[in-house]
A protein has these predicted regions:
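Conserved catalytic core of the tyrosine transesterase superfamily
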Residues: 1-195
Length: 195
């Protein structure tokens, strides 16, 4: 398990601590921000010639990332990074069906992390005077409606509930089907919430 408090350079660690303690983001969200920004800074160091051109991205340290590097980033740098993500980044490198290019939603999440980092540096930490990511657009995402079960599919699903926790599982599925709950909402549900 990663611990950004030990691995992140100070400028990045301060941002991540802010998100976890002040913004109240979950540890998992903050860890994902760290991974996204670590990869971005690795790419920047490679792209700006701060490491040898043939250095594998995963072997580039970000310990020396500081305000000079962060402050030199332009929209063009981020567009180059997005191009790398969409064409060259290996998806699931240890998988037998590894392919190149991240999906638009995956790239959009990375854009959100970069945008949030620069917003923090500008508005909260006041380390840079102008936010270079203010005009950064997210990749276009196709809007799709959720797929719903029809009545017969819902009945069939409920009829196939069995096992040691049949009553509990039936109740959970009934809540999902009738209330449209998300998994996080269901997990956070307490007996006292039900009237």
């Amino acid at each position: 398990m990663i611990d950004y408090r030990l691995e992140a350079p100070p400028i990045l660690r301060d941002f991540l601590v802010y998100h976890e303690t002040i913004q109240g983001h979950s540890r998992r969200t903050v860890d994902e921000y760290f991974l996204d920004l670590r990869n971005f800074f690795r790419f920047l160091k490679l792209d700006k010639g701060r490491v040898a051109r043939n250095t594998p991205l995963g072997q580039i340290s970000i310990d020396d990332v500081d305000l000079d590097l962060v402050g030199s980033v332009t929209l063009s740098d981020v567009y180059a990074y997005m191009n790398y993500l969409s064409r060259d980044r290996v998806v699931h490198p240890n998988s037998p069906d590894a392919r190149n290019g991240l999906s638009a939603p995956a790239r959009a999440r990375k854009v959100a992390a970069i945008r949030s980092f620069y917003k923090y540096l500008t508005n909260k930490a006041k380390l840079i005077s102008e936010n270079p990511m203010q005009d950064l657009d997210s990749p276009h995402l196709k809007k799709s409606l959720p797929r719903y079960l029809d009545l017969e599919e819902s009945v069939s699903l409920l009829e196939h509930v069995d096992g040691a926790n049949q009553a509990r599982d039936y109740c959970i599925l009934t809540l999902f089907l009738n209330c449209g709950l998300r998994i996080s909402e269901l997990v956070g549900l307490n007996v006292t919430d039900v009237r």
